[in-house]
């Protein structure tokens, strides 16, 4: 019996397949909003999984104890809440996601300083590539809105190294702060995925129940009353 690959390997393969279209996004945007929405939902749900980045970070930095895990998850770095995201219009939601992921992309670039050999933590660079792919799709989805969303075309930004500060925290505190940031990032992406799910459900529901949709579908359940029919006929009879 052949051994099954570990979960992390399966997740890495899934991520590689899902974000394979990243290089194509730079060549042009898809004109299919359902296709883009499907990709965005999948991307958000997968990156919302802590196994894609937080869990490898915890293991790599020796934070895998109940106390240290609690320190990571009890005080996450603040990201836009799910309630706030639900209240935004579609253009504002896309703009918020695009800007927030830009901040995450730069912050993950600063994480490089924690790893003398970046190949020791390949999940970090993979996560940054995935974020760039999501931002590309957000940009493409924004182009399909009417009026289109004004966000800059995605480009390869700088290396993302952080500027030196006057009071540098200790190594252990840097690890805890980074862990909190990653936990907040995963929670944010989970919220983004759930909002995108509602986009699909809400658009179909509102379209089916709209008066215009009923008229286009020839809904004959709503008929004028007999009195209104008689009045209309009398108005058509020449006098």
UniProtKB/Swiss-Prot annotation:
PROSITE patterns: LIF_OSM (PS00590). Disulfide bonds join 29-140, 72-179. Residues 209-239 form a propeptide. The keyword ATP-binding does not apply. Residues 1-25 form the signal peptide. Propeptide processing is not important for receptor binding activity but may be important growth-inhibitory activity. Growth regulator. Inhibits the proliferation of a number of tumor cell lines. It regulates cytokine production, including IL-6, G-CSF and GM-CSF from endothelial cells. Uses only type II OSM receptor (heterodimers composed of OSMR and IL6ST). Involved in the maturation of fetal hepatocytes, thereby promoting liver development and regeneration. This is Oncostatin-M. It comes from Rattus norvegicus. The gene is Osm.
